[in-house]
A protein has these predicted regions:
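Solvent-exposed strand-to-loop "edge" motifs in beta-rich extracellular domains
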Residues: 95-101, 124, 176, 198
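Extracellular carbohydrate-recognition regions
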Residues: 23-49
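Short carbohydrate-recognition loop motifs
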Residues: 54-77
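Extracellular/lumenal carbohydrate-interaction signature centered on repeated Trp-anchored short motifs
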Residues: 81-92, 162-165, 186
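Extracellular beta-strand elements of beta-rich domains used
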Residues: 32, 193, 212-215
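Extracellular ligand-binding interfaces
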Residues: 99-167, 206-209
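Bacterial N-terminal signal peptides
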Residues: 8-18
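Extracellular beta-strand ligand-recognition surfaces/modules
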Residues: 114-119, 151-152, 156-161, 165-203
Length: 218
């Protein structure tokens, strides 16, 4: 994971973005069906490279339109500015699939802090929740891992290891409840979503897919 300047980059990027689609009971963040730019980035999103060159593409995996992330000793993310009131849309759902985990990855140590799939929910310049598919850390673990003063990034391990590797997994999280549990207060609006992959700490490689990211009413 990459925390320095996380929130500044999520909230202050100057890319002209397409609006989030709101339709009654849901707010579509992306279904990877929107047009892509000349560089292959979906409309409304920004590709941010931290270490090395990004290997991202919008693909069809069977009948699923998805964002494919490949990492070889690199770190990069796809991010979008959004505005979501969690009192109205508390549920975040998405599909993800990991086809290769970074060998030895474990977010609990800075030297091994690599994951094939991470979904950041940014609330401000100082607070975020990140849902991860880790190589080693146990499912259900929740920890503050930000090394930056005055910034809190709460990590929630949703998947770990190879048990479901190569399979599409559907996740649903009540982000409103998660925020109250992790921060002990009412959540502010969600300001940004970030999809990330990295393998530079372990010097390995990884691959994952994301699809159908949206917020829903309860």
């Amino acid at each position: 994971m990459s925390f320095p300047k996380l929130f500044q980059s999520v909230l202050l990027f100057v890319l002209i973005f397409a609006p989030t689609v709101q339709a009654g009971d849901s707010m579509i963040i992306t279904d990877f069906s929107s047009p892509v730019s000349a560089s292959g980035v979906p409309a409304g999103w920004e590709l941010k490279e931290k270490n090395g060159k990004a290997d991202f593409a919008v693909v069809k995996d069977g009948d699923i339109a998805a964002g494919r992330f490949r990492s070889a000793n690199t770190s990069y993310s796809l991010q979008k500015e959004v505005k979501v009131d969690l009192k109205q849309y508390p549920l975040l759902t998405w599909k993800w699939k990991v086809t290769k985990l970074p060998a030895g990855g474990d977010f609990r140590k800075s030297k091994t802090d690599d994951q094939a799939a991470q979904l950041f929910v940014a609330f401000s310049k100082t607070k975020a929740i990140v849902y991860i598919w880790d190589t080693t850390a146990p499912v259900g673990l929740m920890e503050d891992t930000s090394p930056v003063p005055f910034m809190t990034v709460m990590v929630v391990v949703l998947r770990s290891g190879t048990n479901e590797i190569g399979k599409w997994v559907v996740e649903t999280r009540n982000v409103y409840d998660d925020y109250k549990k992790l921060y002990g207060s009412e959540p502010p609006a969600v300001n940004g979503i970030r999809l990330q992959i990295n393998s530079q700490h372990t010097g390995t490689s990884a691959e994952s897919y994301f699809a159908d990211v949206l917020f829903k009413r309860q």
